[in-house]
Amino acid sequence: MPGFWWLSGLIVGFIGSLIAAFGLTINLLISWFATPISALPASALGVFLVLASLYSMSHALGSSVVFKQALAGATMWTLGLISAIGVLVVSGVLWDMLYIMFHVKGGLYMIVEAYPSLIAAIFIPNAVAGLIGSIMWFKSLRELAELSQEYGFMMAGMSGLVGALLVLTGATLLLTSQAGIPIYIFGVAVQAVTWALLAGAYIQALVNELF
């Protein structure tokens, strides 16, 4: 019988997955009319957390092997998507910055003026998403299940944070298009802190597992 903290983690993880799914929906609806490419890695990360939570629950409840294999395949496919899109978007942002710096008059001033918020909103989330996806791509799903048992409560909380972050990302993108940078700065600052906490928690869990 699983311990109290693992069961609590599964329950909170299920709730966090619902939050992540809600955030994913809002994010996609908003980004459909704004910047869909930059939103994809965050959305894919939300999908991954939902799949990971479902796999953990199926592992606890003893679901069929076919169901587990289907979830395993979907989860690994999503991890690959996170890594690929994250790297592509980060590369695109860097390319845009270099192009503006060297080919646009006053380009350096434009970058200093506008790009800090852009980096916080797009570069950091996609870099972190790509990093997490790349690291976990090389971890088997069995090890992921063991991680979810040992760090179930923490991972559940992280899924809730990602769900909230997805809503925040979409909201700040919308606010930027309507009200400009001043309102946007607060949102991207919160995003940067949240992503840093998310990356730190997962990397710590992986390091503890490996060493």
What are these regions (language model features)?
Residues 1-95, 100, 108, 125-171, ...:
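Membrane-interface extramembranous regions at the lipid-water interface
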Residues 109-121:
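Short aromatic-rich membrane-water interface segments that cap or initiate transmembrane helices
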Residues 177-181:
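Membrane-interface helix caps and helix-loop-helix hairpins in membrane proteins
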